[in-house]
């Protein structure tokens, strides 16, 4: 079983420059509990705090890296969890292409930045995002079944998709929001850390 400190440190690693509330959501802990743990981690030199936002120190990174195998050995040995992760990686490639298609558009045979003036084009991409989400839901259910904490991503992805489908285009990929792409990226980072894999660029 993980400690509160590990869960908070893991949350800081996932939500870089996040505040206590954002970290609490990822850690699955109450905000007050996270604030208390962060104070201790700050005093121990494991995190840095700037204007209420936190990040790991080199010491904190080393401590966290050393704990992952100990706390996640069960998940790493779980064949169903690993299989679900591999299916996630297949869909991850599709999402990367979808986000490229969202952020750029073909004009005269050249890809240029999408200014989102073509509403029909945007709606087609959002429709594809909805289809991708439907394909991903059973995979995410498998992941959450093994690690219930991951349920926060199911809630956030669903909320972002709903907003995008309702016309709030920023919720597709805006890095300043818990957009679909932002939350997906954090889920990917979470899974990589759980399993001890490196991100492929």
Language-model regions, residue ranges each:
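Short, amphipathic alpha-helical interaction segments positioned at domain boundaries
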Residues: 61-87
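C-terminal regulatory/effector modules of DNA-binding transcriptional regulators
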Residues: 152-201
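A short, conserved structural fragment
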Residues: 42-52
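Intrinsically disordered, low-complexity terminal tails/loops enriched in metal-binding residues
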Residues: 16-19, 83, 103-104, 171, ...
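Accessory beta->alpha helical hairpin/"wing" motif in late/C-terminal subdomains of nucleic-acid enzymes
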Residues: 51-64
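Short amphipathic alpha-helical interface segments
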Residues: 2-29
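Short amphipathic alpha-helical interaction segments
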Residues: 27-43
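Exposed, interaction-prone assembly regions rather than primary DNA-binding/catalytic cores
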Residues: 79-165, 169
């Amino acid at each position: 079983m993980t400690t509160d400190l590990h869960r908070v440190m893991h949350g800081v690693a996932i939500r870089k420059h996040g505040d206590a509330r954002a970290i609490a959501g990822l850690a699955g802990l109450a905000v007050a509990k996270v604030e208390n743990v962060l104070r201790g981690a700050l005093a121990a030199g494991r995190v840095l705090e700037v204007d209420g936002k936190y990040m790991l120190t080199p010491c904190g990174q080393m401590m966290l890296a050393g704990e992952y195998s100990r706390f996640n050995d069960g998940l790493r040995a779980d064949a169903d969890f690993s299989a679900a992760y591999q299916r996630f990686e297949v869909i991850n490639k599709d999402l990367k292409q979808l986000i490229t298609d969202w952020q750029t558009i073909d004009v005269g045979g050249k890809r240029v930045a999408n200014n989102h003036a073509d509403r029909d084009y945007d709606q087609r991409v959002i429709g594809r995002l909805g289809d991708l989400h439907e394909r991903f839901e059973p995979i995410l259910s498998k992941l959450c079944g093994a690690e219930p904490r991951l349920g926060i991503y199911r809630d956030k992805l669903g909320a972002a998709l709903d907003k995008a489908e309702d016309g709030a285009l920023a919720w597709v990929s805006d890095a300043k929001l818990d957009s679909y792409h932002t939350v997906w990226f954090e889920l990917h980072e979470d899974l990589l850390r759980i399993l001890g894999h490196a991100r492929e660029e």
